Design a protein with these regions (language model features):
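A residue-level marker of the well-folded mature domains of exported/periplasmic proteins
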Residues: 25-361
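Boundary at the C-terminal end of the N-terminal hydrophobic targeting segment
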Residues: 19-24
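Bacterial N-terminal signal peptides that target proteins for export
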Residues: 1-9
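Residue-level micro-sites within transmembrane alpha helices that shape
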Residues: 2-3, 17, 260
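Bacterial N-terminal signal peptides
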Residues: 8-18
C-alpha cells in the first residue's frame, strides 16, 4: 500500500519553508454542496478508513446533510476515476478522498472538473479547487507517551511502527519525549513492520516487544492488533487512528484519534458560502485547528498524570511546540537550537531519534 508512503516527502516538501501568502481566488461551486466520500478501505477496518467513516457521520449530523460514500477504492487511477466520475455524473460537487495514492488522479480530475471541489486526506496535490490535508500526529503521540510513561512499571515502552519514514519517526520520537516528561529514564523500543496494515506482522512485532519485558506498547499502524496483544499479555497499550479501547478495554490508556470532521465541517461551509480558498500548499493540521486529538486517559493512568496530560494538551493548543529546542538526537548531535522550532521540512524528512529510542527491524 502506498497510501502514506510518500506523503512525508511530497506534502512535507510542498509545505516546507513556504509562507502561505499566496492564496487562490475563492472557489464557487455550482449549486449547494452535494458531498461524497471515497474510502480507501472498508468503513469497518478499525483504523484509518473507519476514522474517516466516523468523521463522515459526525459531519452529516453537524451540517444536516447526507454524504454519500463508496469504500474499498484502491490507489490506482483505474479504480479512482470511475468511482469519482460516477459521483460527479450524479450531481456531487464536493469529493472527499482518503489516500495518498489518490493524489495524481485527484489532480487530473480537479483540472477536468473545475466546478467540483476536491479534498484529499493525506494527499499531496493542490489546486484552485483541490486541497490536500493531514495532521501533526506527533502532538497526540507526545501526549499518549505521557500516559504510557505514567502506567509503565519498568519504564520500558515499545512501539509497533509501519515504515521508517519521517511521518512515523516523528511519532516515535514524540512518544519517547512525552514518556520522559513523566519518567526521565523511560525508553522506547520501536519495531518496523514494513507495512501500514498487516495484522500478522503487527502481532509478531507486539509479541516480540512484550517478550523483551516491555509493559506498554504504542503504535503507528492501522489495525488494533497491538492493542489486542497487549491485553493478552496483561500489559498496557496506546492506539492510533481511533479510540481503540473497544478492542482492548483493560490495556488501552490513550489513543490518537482523527476528528476529520473538525476540518470537513468548516471547509464544506466555506465551499457552500463561496468563500473557500484552498491552500496552495495543503492543510497541515494541529490539535487546535482540527488535527488529530486524543482519547485519554484510561482508568489505570493516575489522576495526577492524567491532569498533566490535559495541561500539556492545552499548552500545545496555546502554542507549545513539541519539537521546540534545545533538542539533540541520541548521538548527541544538536537538532534544534534553543529558542528555535524544527521546521516542517525537517519534520517530514526526520531520520534521527531522540535519546531513549531504540529501533529494530
Amino acid at each position: 500500500m502506498i497510501r502514506r508512503v510518500a506523503t512525508c516527502a511530497a506534502l512535507g516538501l510542498a509545505l516546507a519553508g513556504q509562507a502561505q501568502t499566496a492564496s487562490a481566488a475563492p472557489f464557487k461551486p455550482e449549486g449547494t454542496p452535494k458531498v461524497a466520500m471515497v474510502l480507501y478501505g472498508p468503513r469497518t477496518d478499525g483504523g484509518w478508513s473507519q476514522a474517516f467513516e466516523e468523521s463522515r457521520v459526525r459531519t452529516e449530523q453537524a451540517l444536516g446533510i447526507q454524504i454519500a460514500v463508496v469504500e474499498g477504492i484502491k490507489e490506482s487511477a483505474s479504480a479512482i476515476r470511475p468511482a469519482v466520475e460516477l459521483f460527479i455524473k450524479r450531481g456531487y460537487n464536493v469529493i472527499i478522498g482518503t489516500a495518498f495514492g489518490y493524489s495524481d488522479a485527484f489532480k487530473e480530475l480537479a483540472e477536468k472538473y473545475p466546478k467540483v471541489a476536491f479534498l484529499n486526506g493525506s494527499g499531496t496535490t493542490n489546486g484552485p479547487n483541490l486541497e490536500s490535508f493531514y495532521g501533526r500526529t506527533y502532538e497526540s503521540h507526545y501526549l499518549c507517551g505521557m500516559a504510557a510513561g505514567a502506567v509503565s512499571k519498568e519504564g520500558k515502552l515499545g512501539f509497533v511502527a509501519a515504515n521508517p519514514f519521517g511521518v512515523v519517526n516523528w511519532t516515535i520520537n514524540a512518544y519517547e519525549m512525552g514518556a520522559r516528561q513523566i519518567n526521565p529514564k523511560a525508553t522506547t523500543t520501536a519495531i518496523y513492520t514494513g507495512s501500514w496494515n498487516d495484522p500478522v506482522k503487527e502481532r509478531a512485532a507486539a509479541e516480540a516487544l512484550a517478550g523483551q519485558g516491555i509493559d506498554v506498547i504504542g503504535q503507528h499502524v492501522d489495525t488494533p492488533t497491538p492493542q489486542i496483544v497487549a491485553q493478552e499479555k496483561g500489559i498496557h497499550a496506546t492506539g492510533h487512528h481511533r479510540d481503540m479501547k473497544e478492542f482492548a478495554p483493560k490495556a488501552s490508556v490513550c489513543s490518537l484519534v482523527w476528528f476529520w470532521d473538525r476540518y470537513l465541517i468548516p471547509t464544506i461551509k466555506k465551499i457552500g458560502a463561496g468563500t473557500w480558498e484552498p491552500s496552495p500548499y495543503g492543510a497541515f493540521l494541529s490539535i487546535k485547528d482540527g488535527g488529530p486529538d486524543i482519547a485519554c486517559c484510561g482508568a489505570d493512568v493516575p489522576k495526577e498524570a492524567a491532569d498533566r496530560v490535559k495541561a500539556e494538551r492545552q499548552a500545545i493548543i496555546d502554542g507549545k511546540k513539541v519539537y521546540g529546542g534545545p533538542l539533540a538526537d541520541r548521538d548527541g548531535k544538536e537538532r534544534v537550537a534553543a529558542g528555535a522550532t524544527l521546521s516542517d521540512a525537517d519534520l517530514w524528512k526526520m531520520d534521527w531519534f531522540v535519546p531513549g529510542v531504540v529501533t529494530q527491524r
